[in-house]
Amino acid sequence: MAGRLLLLLLCAALPDELRAEGGVFIKKESADKFLERTKRANSFLEEMKQGNIERECNEERCSKEEAREAFEDNEKTEEFWNIYVDGDQCSSNPCHYGGQCKDGLGSYTCSCLDGYQGKNCEFVIPKYCKINNGDCEQFCSIKKSVQKDVVCSCTSGYELAEDGKQCVSKVKYPCGKVLMKRIKRSVILPTNSNTNATSDQDVPSTNGSILEEVFTTTTESPTPPPRNGSSITDPNVDTRIVGGDECRPGECPWQAVLINEKGEEFCGGTILNEDFILTAAHCINQSKEIKVVVGEVDREKEEHSETTHTAEKIFVHSKYIAETYDNDIALIKLKEPIQFSEYVVPACLPQADFANEVLMNQKSGMVSGFGREFEAGRLSKRLKVLEVPYVDRSTCKQSTNFAITENMFCAGYETEQKDACQGDSGGPHVTRYKDTYFVTGIVSWGEGCARKGKYGVYTKLSRFLRWVRTVMRQK
């Protein structure tokens, strides 16, 4: 029965051949042609050709090996095979915050951008202030929340930009900005003068103790104190700056100069705002009358940028120790406010953490003044500025026999002839961060000027920021 059915099918499929031959049988060539099976596999010549993914896998189901032959690249084969087997797991864009998705067999992998983590990059990695200052241009703090996000803020005269990171000025002459390129620094040491004591005035300090406005009589320039607390008589051991470059108008706009009753310059200072000048406590006893000049860059020339101001009140830190120069800091309240310009601008006050963790971890700071051009030399006619590297604390302590307290730090060069010198005392030590200059220290004391193996010693402002801000509120 099956044979008859097959015969009928053959007859139906080949009516022309049957009629042509007039019988049941057909020629061998025709029969072979009809019964020949078409192979799916490549012919010999096709096997010699490079694989084709369309031919190998899209026309019919293929194996991974056939796909590899088509791509001739393991990585591309894996990418294709993962989608070919079970579809593209990345088609739904599962990776958040710009993460890149890579398909797998029954799964996917997200490569997250910096700052994000999780299977789908869905979690924001909290930034910390110790890492690149939290990307803040100025101050950085950690928000007290579950994720502990970074919060940026700005010093006085600035406000946060829309990005929450940058600080933009909201005043005409913002602190810490130099409108012209700057040159290096120099330092001055107060000259000897007789002074008379005046009345004291008390104001509350941050710790509840009494802050005194004090003038004491002295006939000597300040010298660094020995470790045993007694004074030393070496006339070459003085407070100071040496070997800087000239500071042109507007390049050191926060520089202030203290003038005695004879019209002589004896110390430096830093402009903090229109009412207050920061200086060293040991400068205060150098004259019974103090005036402050700002905007000056040449002692023998009228630049028409300088103005002179009278000291109304003087605040010396209540814990200042003259024998050791500890807590060597004072503030001068001016009777007439300073008018700011492109030549006269205050330096910025930092926050303590910002000063300690960011500013003082910079390579160097800047000091400026009209100090002596070399040890026992004459005072500089021109304002000078000098870059001074921060010095490791242990190196600083090992370089001197005098006490280096927690309220001091060292800066300068071990062998180069560059340093602060006599007459620069009380002057500014500022540090630049993202084109803004912040006060980091006060020129305090040193052993000679630019001596080999010796460094300049500065009052560490971050230890006194609360005190400074408390006094500046005493208007």
Swiss-Prot record:
Residues 86-122, 125-168 form the EGF-like domain. It comes from Gallus gallus. Residues 21-40, 186-240 form a propeptide. Liver and chorioallantoic membrane. This is Coagulation factor X. It catalyses: Selective cleavage of Arg-|-Thr and then Arg-|-Ile bonds in prothrombin to form thrombin. Its main location: secreted. Belongs to the peptidase S1 family. GO terms for molecular function: calcium ion binding; phospholipid binding; serine-type endopeptidase activity. Keywords: Blood coagulation, Calcium, Cleavage on pair of basic residues, Disulfide bond, EGF-like domain, Gamma-carboxyglutamic acid, Glycoprotein, Hemostasis, Hydrolase, Hydroxylation, Protease, Repeat, Secreted, Serine protease, Signal, Zymogen. The modification (3R)-3-hydroxyaspartate is found at D103. Residues 1-20 form the signal peptide. InterPro entries: Coagulation_fac-like_Gla_dom, EGF-like_Ca-bd_dom, EGF-like_dom, EGF-type_Asp/Asn_hydroxyl_site, EGF_Ca-bd_CS, GLA-like_dom_SF, GLA_domain, Growth_fac_rcpt_cys_sf.
